[in-house]
Curated annotation (Swiss-Prot):
GO terms for biological process: protein secretion by the type II secretion system. The keyword Ligase does not apply. Keywords: Cell inner membrane, Cell membrane, Membrane, Protein transport, Transmembrane, Transmembrane helix, Transport. Residues 1-4 are cytoplasmic. The chain crosses the membrane at residues 5-25. The gene is exeN. This is Type II secretion system protein N. It is found in: Cell inner membrane. PROSITE patterns: T2SP_N. Signal peptide: none annotated. Involved in a type II secretion system (T2SS, formerly general secretion pathway, GSP) for the export of proteins.
């Protein structure tokens, strides 16, 4: 008798789960407690299991063609995860898998964005006019949220076709790369950049207490603008290979 009750209960739970994921996305969105002046959704279609939003507006930012696919098996593991895809090739776009198992996690994440789009959203005022060119691509193989930054992280940030135009001249940067890892809850980014104008190598560490430290070197190249070369002595004395020391620390 107990076995029959257990089987019936399992079937009931499975049926209720089926009904839940088949809920129309428009019905779910209608009952979400979204702040009306901050978040707006347009063109919602599909179901809770699989659907899309033509446009998601958050404050002054927006995402287009947001699509999702809920992993049903992940619900049985009590670690729901969803595959996301959004944007178009002309602007911000990306895809990946994100979820929650007591903390946020993600894998196979790719994010593409034009470099000028990022510069326009830098929160601090720059001391001089600056324009940039190129395309940024973030790839995250694995990520697990920690306290406060991360427990696990393997990824890379590339800046393809990187160029910067400053009052001191145009600065070709090649294709800079950041290798992203997490070590003992510290967010670590290793920078490797090289061009005919300048070569920069270094490591940035962000501590759990929000302290950061960047240490590296800068080696000028033949195409470095003369006005920029004049400022190199302020960095200190170069080593035997012509590399100037870089060190910045502070708190965010």
């Amino acid at each position: 008798m107990k076995q029959k009750v257990l089987i019936a209960a399992l079937f009931l739970v499975a049926y209720l789960g089926f009904l839940l994921v088949k809920l129309p996305a428009t019905l779910v969105v209608r009952h979400l407690p979204l702040p009306p002046n901050l978040v707006q959704l347009e063109g919602v279609s599909g179901t809770l299991w699989s659907g899309q939003v033509a446009r998601l507006q958050y404050a002054s930012e927006s995402l287009t063609q947001l699509r999702w696919e809920l992993n049903g098996w992940s619900l049985l593991r009590f670690a729901p995860e969803v595959s996301l895809r959004f944007g178009d090739r002309s602007g911000l776009n990306g895809q990946g898998v994100v979820g929650w198992n007591g903390a946020a996690f993600g894998r196979d994440i790719t994010l593409n964005v034009p470099a000028p789009w990022v510069l326009d959203r830098v929160p601090m005022r720059l001391p001089f006019p600056l324009t940039v060119a190129g395309q940024l691509q973030l790839k995250v193989d694995q990520f697990a949220q920690g306290n406060p930054w991360c427990d696990n992280l393997y990824g890379n940030l590339h800046w393809y076709g990187a160029d910067a135009d400053t009052p001191a001249g145009k600065l070709p940067l090649g294709d800079p790369e950041l290798k992203l890892t997490c070590i003992d809850s510290r967010l670590v980014a290793e920078l490797k950049q090289g061009s005919e104008a300048v070569q920069v190598l270094g490591k940035l560490e962000l501590q759990p207490n929000r302290q950061y430290l960047f240490q590296g070197t800068l080696k000028p190249g033949p195409e470095l603008p003369d006005q920029m070369k004049q400022g190199l002595p302020f960095l200190g004395q170069p080593d035997g290979q012509g590399r100037f020391p870089l060190r910045y620390q502070g708190r965010i």
